[in-house]
Design a protein with these regions (language model features):
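Solvent-exposed loop/turn and edge beta-strand elements of beta-rich ligand-binding domains
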Residues: 1-210
Length: 210
């Protein structure tokens, strides 16, 4: 069957996705509270993985990391006292499509508190600890935007130590003071035993305590 573009029975389908247009980008920021940070565990390093499918059906996967060195932490604390410490990465040259970001790394010492975003094309799932973006020109989908961003806020996992004081006969001793010191010799906390001879120190950051 020979076709003619002027044939009224012929339907011509045109792909409206222009590959020559500007591509998308997503910026992810990692935020830490300097008041809840112990650099003795090493430089906190977090890995962000961005996966998605573009409008042509092709799957994509990207990975970037941020590393909080001691020098960087000290600089930010000096320049912006009292503020959160933040580092960002940007995924550039993204084809139009839907992309989801999650994080990894340092799970032994840190937990994710929350994900926030001011981007209208972002959908956050706090339970799954992910954020999804619709990347494309305005109007391509109901939420599409060329750029997007989100912030992952983390907190160091805190532990506790329970101490029990008894005499040689096994009797619980009350009002016995214990002092907890960190690996650098600094006093972290002190408290006295209760009527059961017990004392608990909560809110301890990862470290070696004496």
């Amino acid at each position: 069957y020979d076709t003619d573009e002027n044939d009224q029975d012929l339907t011509v389908i045109t792909n409206t996705h222009d590959r020559t247009g500007p591509k998308g980008s997503i910026t992810i920021t990692k935020a830490l509270d300097p008041g809840n940070l112990n650099m003795d565990v090493g430089d906190p390093t977090f890995i962000f993985t961005l996966t998605g499918t573009d409008v042509y059906g092709k799957k994509h996967s990207y990975e970037k990391k941020v590393k909080f060195t001691k020098a960087e932490v000290e600089k930010q604390m000096k320049d912006h006292p009292g503020d959160l410490i933040e580092l960002s990465v940007t995924f550039d040259d993204l084809e139009y499509g839907t992309y989801t970001c999650n994080e990894g790394g340092m799970i032994k010492y840190f937990k994710l508190l929350n994900i926030t975003s001011n981007s209208s094309n972002a959908t956050i799932d706090q339970e799954k600890e992910t954020v999804t973006f619709d990347i494309g020109p305005t109007g391509m989908t109901a939420k599409a935007q060329l750029t997007g961003g989100a912030k992952f806020m983390n907190q160091m996992i805190q532990g506790s130590v329970k101490l029990i004081k008894k005499d040689s006969k096994g009797k619980s001793l009350r009002n016995i003071e214990f002092v907890i010191t960190s690996s650098d010799g600094a006093e972290v906390a002190k408290a006295k035993t209760d009527s059961d001879g017990e004392v608990t120190f909560d809110g301890l950051l990862p470290d070696t305590y004496t």
